[in-house]
């Protein structure tokens, strides 16, 4: 944490972060929020030594134009801080669990075939850069791996060179969401792509650790995939033709999941039997997280809706059209 904590809650914030990291949680995002909370306390409650309801609820109050989902993410670490303080014998007010209201589930953009074709065609035109010698090789493979394997962008970004077995196609995903490792098997065409990529990049960075190296041969920072996406997507003709939320890098993962479900239905597969496999492949902790995609598949693919209505009528969740 480069920011120097300055409020009277500094020792407790440091203690909570240390506790989380000791048991294996990166806790990076929450640490940033706790840093902001420390600034908030230093500015508005510089003499406070007790985490009171007044301080906590002032922090928890919804800000102008703030989405309820971000409000939820902003409150959670402070609730954890109060619980940590109570656990070591220091009185602190715990923000009630019903604050804020239930999060609104994000409706992803499901890429169409023309959109995918246009995007991948565009990134394939990437030219070598004198400032980053491997970037023109990294970008096309990075996005194909995210889409073809349904990876979270961070999972692809943080791949190590040894995480993909070029002989078997076994890919190891380390410490992903929920801090769980998992193994993903690559399709033959994706594996062939990775082999060609590895051969070329290893000539540039023979001793690198990052599978997708930046200009120094190290891991890219978390903001780069979004930057790349908008760099290539925003000027495409198809970019302005969509309904709902604007596309994001993470939506390639959603598109993979929805298309996989539709493919299984077209093949006459039993979705009830296959859904747990998709859940494990995606690294979901709960099967309900995977059920989420069934609704989008039924909306996006008429064939899916027609064939699966009777087969999994009890499995398709009702749409929750809660408004922001």
Where are these regions (language model features)?
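Conserved catalytic core of the tyrosine transesterase superfamily
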Residues: 1-324
């Amino acid at each position: 944490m480069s920011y120097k904590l300055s409020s009277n809650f500094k020792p407790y914030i440091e203690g909570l972060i240390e506790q989380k990291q000791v048991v294996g949680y990166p806790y990076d995002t929450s640490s940033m929020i706790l840093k902001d909370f420390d600034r908030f306390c230093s500015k508005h409650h510089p003499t406070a030594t007790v985490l009171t309801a007044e301080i906590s609820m002032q922090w928890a109050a919804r800000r102008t134009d703030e989405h309820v989902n971000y409000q939820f993410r902003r409150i959670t670490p402070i609730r954890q801080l109060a619980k940590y303080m109570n656990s070591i014998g220091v009185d602190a007010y715990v923000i009630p669990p019903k604050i804020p209201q239930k999060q609104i589930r994000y409706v992803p953009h499901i890429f169409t075939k023309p959109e995918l074709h246009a995007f991948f065609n565009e990134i394939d035109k990437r030219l070598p850069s004198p400032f980053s010698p491997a970037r023109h090789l990294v970008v096309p493979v990075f996005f194909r791996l995210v889409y073809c394997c349904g990876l979270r962008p961070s999972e692809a970004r943080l791949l190590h060179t040894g995480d993909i077995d070029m002989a078997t196609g076994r890919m190891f995903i380390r410490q992903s969401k929920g801090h769980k490792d998992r193994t993903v098997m690559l399709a033959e065409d994706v594996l062939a792509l990775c082999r060609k990529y590895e051969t070329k990049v290893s000539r540039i960075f023979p001793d690198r650790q990052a599978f997708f190296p930046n200009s120094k041969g190290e891991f890219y920072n978390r903001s780069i995939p979004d930057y790349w996406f908008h760099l290539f997507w925003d000027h495409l003709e198809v970019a302005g033709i969509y309904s709902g939320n604007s596309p994001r890098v993470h939506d390639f993962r959603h598109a993979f999941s929805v298309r996989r479900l539709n493919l299984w239905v077209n093949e006459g597969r039993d979705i009830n039997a296959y859904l747990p496999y998709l859940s494990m492949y995606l690294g979901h902790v709960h099967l309900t997280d995977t059920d989420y995609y069934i609704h989008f598949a039924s909306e996006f693919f008429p064939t899916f809706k027609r064939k699966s209505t009777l087969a999994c009528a009890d499995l398709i969740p009702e749409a929750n059209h809660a408004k922001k």
